[in-house]
Amino acid sequence: MPELPEVETVRRGLNQLTLNRKITGGDVLLHRTIAHPFSVGDFLNGITGSTISTWHRRGKYLLAELSASPSTTSIPWLGVHLRMTGQLLWLNQDEPLHKHTRVRIFFEEEQELRFVDQRTFGQMWWVPPGIAVESVITGLAKLAVDPFSPEFTVEYLANKLHNRRRPIKTALLDQSVVAGLGNIYADEALFKSGVLPETLCTEVQLKQIKLLRTAIIQVLETSIEAGGTTFSNFLNVKGVNGNYGGVAWVYNRAGEPCKVCGDVIQRIKLGGRSSHFCRQCQV
């Protein structure tokens, strides 16, 4: 699943390519991609004629701020969640359709934003002007603070973790604890901070939480600089792979030597997800 760095990479690409471009129409090939409460017709009618002012990211959600009608001061929104395998690709309209194409958004000059999604879990929303974004895209209301927010302090993270009697890796995947963090970067941050993934939150010391907060920010920044991670489906808006996988410390490296101590990287199942770590470097 695309995590914060992959979604941020897509956001930056969209801001480079789609701003101030007029949406001329669209085509929804898989109707369930358009999330309730609005219909496919509402979605297409709502976005057609709009221009994109800017793209925002909240956790793993992408939010396009659309141009408002002259008669109102409130703005409509276009929301996207890539889920497991979603891709947003900026293409010429005459490009052959990929078999997993779900939604096409047409722009002037024969360009389009194409939503491709093999597993079909991805979703798109239209939020009319005058309606709170969180009332339509309800998952936004449950998100924790962003790791790049000033609110993501040591005290904040300690308060989120200390009363949870579950492995710290499992807690870090909870979007109400840290928004945008997923399996890849939780493993990487735990390695950088020297904490084993199965350590209970109640057993993590404050000095470890300080290291963990710093590590989370560092690994996310490093991955964004590398354009994210591609192990299976992720592509940026130009169809290019991310490169963080080549510099990963532990993720997807089971059986290989640790880059720090040379011990073998191990993998276990924790909460139904694979966790990668080094027994020598993490305690």
Swiss-Prot record:
<dbReference type="GO" id="GO:0003684">
    <property type="term" value="F:damaged DNA binding"/>
</dbReference>
<dbReference type="InterPro" id="IPR000214">
    <property type="entry name" value="Znf_DNA_glyclase/AP_lyase"/>
</dbReference>
<feature type="binding site">
    <location>
        <position position="119"/>
    </location>
    <ligand>
        <name>DNA</name>
    </ligand>
</feature>
<dbReference type="GO" id="GO:0006284">
    <property type="term" value="P:base-excision repair"/>
</dbReference>
<dbReference type="Pfam" id="PF01149">
    <property type="entry name" value="Fapy_DNA_glyco"/>
</dbReference>
<dbReference type="GO" id="GO:0034039">
    <property type="term" value="F:8-oxo-7,8-dihydroguanine DNA N-glycosylase activity"/>
</dbReference>
<protein>
    <recommendedName>
        <fullName>Formamidopyrimidine-DNA glycosylase</fullName>
        <ecNumber>3.2.2.23</ecNumber>
        <ecNumber>4.2.99.18</ecNumber>
    </recommendedName>
</protein>
<keyword id="KW-0326">Glycosidase</keyword>
<dbReference type="GO" id="GO:0140078">
    <property type="term" value="F:class I DNA-(apurinic or apyrimidinic site) endonuclease activity"/>
</dbReference>
<dbReference type="InterPro" id="IPR012319">
    <property type="entry name" value="FPG_cat"/>
</dbReference>
<feature type="active site" description="Proton donor; for delta-elimination activity">
    <location>
        <position position="273"/>
    </location>
</feature>
<keyword id="KW-0863">Zinc-finger</keyword>
<dbReference type="InterPro" id="IPR015886">
    <property type="entry name" value="DNA_glyclase/AP_lyase_DNA-bd"/>
</dbReference>
<comment type="subunit">
    <text>Monomer.</text>
</comment>
<dbReference type="GO" id="GO:0008270">
    <property type="term" value="F:zinc ion binding"/>
</dbReference>
<feature type="active site" description="Schiff-base intermediate with DNA">
    <location>
        <position position="2"/>
    </location>
</feature>
<dbReference type="InterPro" id="IPR035937">
    <property type="entry name" value="MutM-like_N-ter"/>
</dbReference>
<feature type="active site" description="Proton donor; for beta-elimination activity">
    <location>
        <position position="60"/>
    </location>
</feature>
<keyword id="KW-0862">Zinc</keyword>
<keyword id="KW-0511">Multifunctional enzyme</keyword>
<dbReference type="Pfam" id="PF06827">
    <property type="entry name" value="zf-FPG_IleRS"/>
</dbReference>
<dbReference type="InterPro" id="IPR010663">
    <property type="entry name" value="Znf_FPG/IleRS"/>
</dbReference>
<keyword id="KW-0456">Lyase</keyword>
<dbReference type="Pfam" id="PF06831">
    <property type="entry name" value="H2TH"/>
</dbReference>
<feature type="active site" description="Proton donor">
    <location>
        <position position="3"/>
    </location>
</feature>
<keyword id="KW-0238">DNA-binding</keyword>
<keyword id="KW-0479">Metal-binding</keyword>
<dbReference type="InterPro" id="IPR010979">
    <property type="entry name" value="Ribosomal_uS13-like_H2TH"/>
</dbReference>
<feature type="binding site">
    <location>
        <position position="164"/>
    </location>
    <ligand>
        <name>DNA</name>
    </ligand>
</feature>
<feature type="zinc finger region" description="FPG-type">
    <location>
        <begin position="249"/>
        <end position="283"/>
    </location>
</feature>
<keyword id="KW-0378">Hydrolase</keyword>
<feature type="binding site">
    <location>
        <position position="100"/>
    </location>
    <ligand>
        <name>DNA</name>
    </ligand>
</feature>
<dbReference type="InterPro" id="IPR020629">
    <property type="entry name" value="Formamido-pyr_DNA_Glyclase"/>
</dbReference>
<keyword id="KW-0234">DNA repair</keyword>
<keyword id="KW-0227">DNA damage</keyword>
<comment type="similarity">
    <text>Belongs to the FPG family.</text>
</comment>
<dbReference type="InterPro" id="IPR015887">
    <property type="entry name" value="DNA_glyclase_Znf_dom_DNA_BS"/>
</dbReference>
<comment type="function">
    <text>Involved in base excision repair of DNA damaged by oxidation or by mutagenic agents. Acts as a DNA glycosylase that recognizes and removes damaged bases. Has a preference for oxidized purines, such as 7,8-dihydro-8-oxoguanine (8-oxoG). Has AP (apurinic/apyrimidinic) lyase activity and introduces nicks in the DNA strand. Cleaves the DNA backbone by beta-delta elimination to generate a single-strand break at the site of the removed base with both 3'- and 5'-phosphates.</text>
</comment>
